[in-house]
Regions:
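Short S/T/G/P-rich N-terminal loop/turn motif that feeds into the first structured element of a domain
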Residues: 1-95
């Protein structure tokens, strides 16, 4: 399992969340996404950060290479290609 931290530039937050929670969720599940959590950054309107949990790097790459995913991102109002940072868990610690 891997985690991915994404920075996404988008036009309208409600449009983005609407597509992300429906067509986007379907596409992510198809390609092995286990969960996603969306964050806003104070003072950065037009941008969200997303933390994904994915079954494997290969599954995530399959997601990125799917032409339907690109179309879904465009319909969400995503501007350009999101920036993805792949994270490897080092430790789970309490508190």
């Amino acid at each position: 399992m891997i985690h991915i931290w994404a920075t996404v530039e988008m036009g309208d937050l409600q449009q983005f969340i609407g597509v992300f929670a429906t067509a986007g969720a379907k596409a992510r599940r198809k390609h092995g996404s286990r969960s996603s959590r969306v964050f806003t950054v104070p003072g950065h309107t037009g941008q969200v950060r997303v933390l994904f949990e994915w079954e494997s790097r290969e599954a995530f790459e399959g997601f990125l290479n799917d032409p339907e995913v690109r179309a879904t991102m465009q319909s969400s109002g995503t501007v350009g290609r999101p920036d993805f940072l792949i994270l490897d868990a080092l430790a789970d610690l309490p508190g």
